[in-house]
Amino acid sequence: MRLLRSSRLLAAVLLAACAGLAQGGDLVVIVSARSQVGALRPEQVAAIFLAQAPRFPNGAVANALDQPVGSALRDQFYLGVSGKTPALLKVYWSKMVFTGRAQPPRELAGSAAVRRAVAEDPALIGYIEREALDPSVRPVLLVH
């Protein structure tokens, strides 16, 4: 009885999570309009955001900015570029921090804050909803 109830609860949670991701539109990975960085592949973006690559492919320093933990946009982004669920991401960063190898990207309050920060600094990279694009930033990857 308890197992059946737990299974139903898990199924409901997974269904809600999938529905939330399906409702989300496209998101874009952005750099400053002043940046010399060209288009990036998903694996290059994942390497930057997972602290495996400290530089853009052109050699310039790369500093990632994240959306808040628990946001649908963040979950969609990491699933799209790295295949990591929120649970796997938490485990990954726990290991990286515990071993002293890296710290997770700095979190900002939302897409507007990420866009403003990225626009001001060519070393920054972030992700926002496609609809939030403006001329101050340039998309380098579209994530479905």
PLM feature segments, named:
Residues 17-19:
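N-terminal signal peptide c-region/cleavage motif recognized by signal peptidases
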Residues 1-11:
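Bacterial N-terminal signal peptides that target proteins for export
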Residues 25-144:
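Exported/periplasmic ABC-transporter solute-binding proteins
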